[in-house]
């Protein structure tokens, strides 16, 4: 099994070597092993390979129109997978979910971070000022 996680503001993915209740031991593509807090794990997946997921998700992220995503994002706090299901389809792929995560993360003028993988829509006034 592979894991996508956030570490110090950066997204990484690797193979889960072991998992406990509070953390997981993950091997990155480089061979480096890292201990990841369970709260930082955002996605679990079997396929594709971690580097492939990140590459495809970055491509998908660039196709997401922020204005459109902001328009139909819920007013309350929401998760990246929720937005992916609203934006793409009810059956958003793993790559689409990760792409939504990357796009939301890089657009603080549209979406504020409300926790690991959680976001809140920025007020309309803030968005107008940013544009």
Spans of model-derived segments:
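Charge-lined substrate channels and their catalytic hotspots, especially those that engage the 3′ end
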Residues: 1-131
